Amino acid sequence: MSAAQILCLGEPLVEFNQTPEGQFAMGFGGDVSNVAISASRHGANAGLITRVGTDPFGAALCGLWTDEGVSTAHVTEAQGEETGVYFVTHDTDGHHFTYRRTGSAASRLAPDDLPLDALQSCPMFYASGISLAVSDSMRAAVVAAAEATRTAGGVFAFDPNLRVALWPLEVAREVTHSVMAACDIALPGLDDARQLTGLQPPEEIVRFYHDLGPRIVALTLGADGVLISVDGDMRTLPGHRVDAKDATGAGDCFNGAFLASLLDTQDPFAAAEHANMAAAISTTGYGAVAPIPTLSHTRSALNAAWQS
């Protein structure tokens, strides 16, 4: 496999989703894993930096990444440790998540685990707010990896991806703003950004993030599309009309498709157009991974949209 163009650091998870019959179907989760898979399906050489346990769940994740063309060269199989899992149950009040991730193999990732040579030769490094919230050691690893990539001339892309169940909002604000100040590409979602910044209008949020440091800000707006800005040149790309069933992982799909397209075209606006369509398509199926479209699927849908 060719050297990775995008290295993604975070915690992968195995999902057990309750079926209508009361059984649990196994699937895969973890935002950074989803981004790597989306980037790979959209033509980039993507790789993961993480740790999994020497258990059937870690083996299943490694098998998934191999099947998806995502490099596992920097995935450590930690002897005697466990892979994080979560359960999704359903009732009249909606979906409920139960996590079993405390002390997981991934949560023990630390700066000493980083493949510095690979990071220094990689054009792009990606992490999320969840990567920062999982543990203090993973947070330190994200900061060190971003510094290694940027010092060598690469770029750092970051999605603040807020999970208040993982850490208090005030702590999340302080840490994510600090990391955002050291990134080149900001990929926030509107709901998360409103909580983190205290601002409401999308344009004000974009200006806030530009002022922190990122040159490129792609603020995803859910079904309303994306507000993409390069050095303050803002353009809103409306959402695409689709038969949406499940928006799980749509933001991750956007991020992977955007970064892959940006590496290919070097045009943030074209990349946002491409990723906007990919994310829309991903909502037409169920789950985070299965509905992520391929490069050819996304291009065909874009061509059809332009011709209509």
State each model region's role:
Residues 124, 130-207, 224-226:
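Conserved beta-alpha-beta core of the PfkB/ribokinase-like small-molecule kinase fold
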